[in-house]
């Protein structure tokens, strides 16, 4: 199983004064994305410490949660026969990685083998062999605790969020979305710097965050995705969680969608689930420029009450460090 090259991470201590960063270098012979979050909730008067190993979490993406993205990506036609209750409802949840417990076997090959390969990196994307076009997909990823009742998920409890690249192959003819998402180690990205979620509501921290994304090519910074507020996802907060629980439990194997519940139960009902909740629309540059060898893809989640988009782009152009309230993912493309 492939592993990420991550060997360091950051702590965030959440207090009445805001987020206070503490850095930790992990000494581990088998480098994992091991993210320690410390969140102090003043109203509860205790400190919550979480050790998180992404390679043991099931990971997913949400298709069609920003109006217009699927059309730009040339994927809207794939969902022609997928019925939704609302016009702006996302189309499907798709898997990007399903961990198998050490003692478990992939009984009856329920989980496609390629989905059991760990695809995440904090620093690079390796170009898929034989493919001509791959595209950055800038997203907000959320880490959840999953509460199970037998083989069904009853609750998804949001823990933290961070910048994510749901990098995708652009080609026609793939039977399932997941076939364009995981082509092996170093095919996806999650920032090593996650931020604790205080409340997954319009009153919580996420409501002031925005998603910006860029391509750095030959030293020049280009805006890649439209600068977008997380609150402007078509489905967000309770509505999104209710929808995701329903899809994780009941989504059928039809069209580009897959039976997610069968994968999760075959994997032993993972306690941690990471979901990238949808890619933003592209700028004109992003629509027409695919990732090439040596390009650097950048996804940044930042609080709009502290920074403007112009300030974020300027800091990137000047190669300045970002503050602890910003989640950043840099990935260099390697052929």
Regions found by a protein language model. Give the residues of each.
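Cysteine-centered motifs
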Residues: 6-9
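Glycine-enriched loop-and-adjacent helix/strand subsegments that border the catalytic/binding cleft
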Residues: 55-266, 311-335
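A conserved acidic, glycine/proline-rich C-terminal tail/linker
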Residues: 262-291
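Conserved "cap/hinge" positions at secondary-structure junctions
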Residues: 277-279, 298-303
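Short, Lys/Arg- and Gly-enriched loop/turn segments at beta-strand edges
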Residues: 285-286, 304-315
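Loop/turn positions that initiate beta-strands
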Residues: 293-295
């Amino acid at each position: 199983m492939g592993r990420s090259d991550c060997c360091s991470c950051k702590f965030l201590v959440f207090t009445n004064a805001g987020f206070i960063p503490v850095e930790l270098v992990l000494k581990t012979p088998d480098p994992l994305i091991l993210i320690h979050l410390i969140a102090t909730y003043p109203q509860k008067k205790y400190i919550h410490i979480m050790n998180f190993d992404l390679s043991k979490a099931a990971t997913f993406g949400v298709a069609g949660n920003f109006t217009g993205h699927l059309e730009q990506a040339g994927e809207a036609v794939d969902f022609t026969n997928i019925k939704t209750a609302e016009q702006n409802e996302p189309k499907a949840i798709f898997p990007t990685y399903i961990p198998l417990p050490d003692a478990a076997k992939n009984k009856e090959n329920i989980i496609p083998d390629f989905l059991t390969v760990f695809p995440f990196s904090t620093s690079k994307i390796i170009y898929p062999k034989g493919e001509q076009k791959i595209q950055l997909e800038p997203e907000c990823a959320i880490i959840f605790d999953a509460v199970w009742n037998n083989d069904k998920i009853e609750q998804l409890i949001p823990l933290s969020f961070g910048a994510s690249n749901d990098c995708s192959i652009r080609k026609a003819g793939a039977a399932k979305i997941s076939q364009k998402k995981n082509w092996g180690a170093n095919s996806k990205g999650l920032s090593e710097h996650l931020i604790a979620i205080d409340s997954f509501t319009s009153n919580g921290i996420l409501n002031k965050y925005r998603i910006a994304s860029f391509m750095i090519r030959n030293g020049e910074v280009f805006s890649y995705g439209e600068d977008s507020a997380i609150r402007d996802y078509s489905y967000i907060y309770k509505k999104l969680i209710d929808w995701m629980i329903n899809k994780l439990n009941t989504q059928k194997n039809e069209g580009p969608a897959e039976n997610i519940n069968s994968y999760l139960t075959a994997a032993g009902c993972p306690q941690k689930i990471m979901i990238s909740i949808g890619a933003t629309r592209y700028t004109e540059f992003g629509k027409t420029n695919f990732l090439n060898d040596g390009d650097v893809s950048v996804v940044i989640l930042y609080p709009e009450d502290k920074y403007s988009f112009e300030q974020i782009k300027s800091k990137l152009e000047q190669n300045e460090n970002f503050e602890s309230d910003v989640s950043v993912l840099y990935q260099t493309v390697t052929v």
